[in-house]
Design a protein with these regions (language model features):
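Non-catalytic accessory regions flanking glycosidase/transglycosidase catalytic cores in CAZymes
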Residues: 15, 20-275, 279-288, 320-547
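Active-site His/acidic residue clusters
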Residues: 293-312
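Extracellular loop and loop/strand-boundary signature of outer-membrane beta-barrel proteins
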Residues: 311-313, 361-362
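Active-site-proximal helices and loops of the catalytic beta/alpha 8
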Residues: 296, 316-317, 321
């Protein structure tokens, strides 16, 4: 157990801030409950629902960058997860990338990944991670080491900028780099841009070529700082100071490559003083305004599989929407066209216990939450143009590894279903269904939770329509009348259903497919039909237009 009197004075604020943020200490006292759900009172069947769709009304264009993720030098996310160079039990690519993990990530169909943090980014000096390995010194994780070796182990710097780009090329994903604002300088950031994007005639482009990578990487997305509004953060400052310093970074970085997109630190109403001065001072140089959200905003010893906790967690999606709307309004208060500076929700997840940083179990409940969050991202497609699940491997993870094996959890499957099947344009739709009142829980406001969620998308040619229905009822199916205007579907509809044996089902190494996506078919000879969405399921109905 840590004792504050034993902590060196210069680290006291950092540790206090971490504890303030996590509201938990020490790590080893917490247990996660994975038992059978307790018996709940029998509930009546919900009334049949209705979905009405008008394919002639396009409500927004969905940016594929909402299907993104995030990796940080923390726990076994990168070292011991994605990059495992000393592991002789698994096949490796490029001397360190785990092939089984790479295959899992490829199948996820992500569009973008952010690196190297997170809080870690504001302590990371990129030059320590380039060149021959023998020149790269092992480092202490300056921020996360206070939470012990499971969360903040030392790292050997063998996964640096070039290894990150090898990783990106292997999975075919857009890179997003967060520079060191907290302990770095504009000059250091500009040199990193030159190393990644400069041609071989430049000083740092030549260094990249010397390290074996002649062709520029052309990294487009660059973040300046991480959660600088927070007292836990290296570089913590007032919004006015952050904005002025942001402009110094932006000027230096764009002098090297004027075509890069810059992401500024934003916040929701918990830091309501933040966005206005940042936008007023630096708005002309901001490509995206970021903000982070972890729900339910309540740290617990355990989270049961009870029906009430099922609805407590799923209701978090609507708290996220409430906060997105607040951020949208904070932008439009300064910049009349709120779409001019879109939102990058570049960290989101469910997080209720510190153990999830190294023991990442998620149930079908959490997959339904993730699906409900994507429903909301689609609904706000005109403003939310980037969203990154945090994080990809082993830390609050979509993918979990041990030294010999890998599995994915229900949140992974929800991301995969949306990223694979949803189309580009959001179509007008309305849902008529029963709701359930859920009381306030942690930071989640009370809400009348619709049992049925829905997102309807169509491709540019308007010949492929995808209806994604989310049955948020813990035990009952929902028969649903679906009516589609201006689209005559072929009689056979492909169905992709994410589900498991109960709302508390989860995957593990010895039962990797308890929760899975199953492909089915459905027959209908009309644009008006009834489909029954199974209990606790996410279902994509893929319809093709009759020729």
């Amino acid at each position: 157990m840590y004792h504050l009197r034993k902590i060196p004075k210069k680290y006291g604020r950092m540790l206090t801030s971490v504890l303030f943020r996590l509201l938990v200490e020490p790590l080893g006292l917490f247990k996660v409950y994975w038992g059978t759900p307790k018996e709940e009172p029998t509930e009546p069947l919900p009334a049949p629902a209705a979905i009405n769709i008008d394919t002639n009304v396009i409500e927004g264009e969905i940016d594929r960058l909402i299907y993104g993720s995030f990796i940080e030098v923390m726990g076994k996310c990168i070292y011991g997860g994605i990059w495992d160079e000393y592991n002789k039990n698994v096949a490796l690519i490029h001397g360190g990338l785990r092939e089984d993990v790479i295959n899992e990530i490829r199948a996820l169909n992500l569009a973008i990944i952010r690196y190297p943090g997170g809080v870690f980014a504001d302590t990371y000096h990129w030059k320590n991670g380039i060149g021959p390995n023998e020149r790269r010194k092992a480092r202490r994780n300056k921020f996360w080491h206070w939470l012990g070796p499971k969360v903040g182990p030392k790292y050997n710097n063998h996964f640096g900028s070039d290894e990150f780009m090898l990783f990106m090329n292997e999975i075919g994903v857009e890179p997003y780099i967060n520079i060191n604002y907290g302990t770095g300088t504009p000059e250091e950031a500009a040199q990193w841009v030159e190393y990644m994007n400069g041609d071989a005639s430049t000083e740092y482009g030549a260094l990249r070529a010397e390290n074996g990578h002649f062709t520029p990487y052309n990294v487009k997305y660059w973040g300046i700082g991480n959660e600088i509004y927070g007292p836990w953060e290296p570089g913590y400052s007032k919004p006015e100071d952050y904005a002025q310093h942001y402009l110094e970074f932006a000027e230096a970085m764009k002098a090297v490559d004027p075509y890069i997109k810059l992401i500024a630190v934003g916040a929701d109403f918990e830091y309501s003083y933040w966005n206005r001065p940042v936008l007023e001072i630096a708005g002309d140089q901001i490509s995206y305004l970021s903000y982070h959200i972890y729900m339910p905003g309540k740290f617990l010893d355990s989270l049961s599989n009870s029906v009430q906790d099922f609805y407590n967690i799923i209701s978090s999606a609507f708290e996220i929407e409430k906060r997105i709307e607040w951020v949208e309004n904070s932008i439009v208060e300064v910049i009349s066209n709120k779409e001019k500076i879109p939102i990058a929700l570049d960290e989101w997840n469910i997080w209720w216990n510190v153990r999830q940083l190294y023991e990442g179990y998620y149930t079908l409940r959490d997959g339904l939450l993730a699906a409900s969050i994507f429903e909301i991202f689609h609904r706000h497609a005109n403003t939310v143009k980037m969203a990154l699940f945090s994080s990809l491997v082993n830390v609050l993870p979509a993918i979990v590894t041990n030294p010999t094996d890998v599995y994915h959890n229900p949140i992974y499957l929800a991301i995969q279903l949306f990223a694979t099947h949803a189309e580009q344009f959001l179509v007008s739709s309305s849902v008529n269904c029963e709701t359930r009142h859920n009381p306030r829980y942690g930071k989640v406001s009370e809400v009348d939770l619709p049992y049925l969620g829905c997102s309807v998308t169509i491709n540019k040619m308007k010949n492929r329509l995808v209806i994604i229905g989310i049955n948020r009822h813990h035990i009952h199916e929902i028969p649903t009348k679906i009516s589609i205007s201006h689209f005559d579907p072929e009689p056979i509809t492909k169905i992709f259903e994410l589900n498991g044996p109960s709302h508390s089902a989860y995957n593990f190494f010895d039962k990797k497919n308890d929760v899975k996506i199953q492909e089915k078919e459905f027959s209908s000879d009309s644009s008006k039909f009834t489909y029954t969405f199974p209990a606790h399921s996410v279902t994509a109905l893929v319809l093709h237009k009759n020729k």
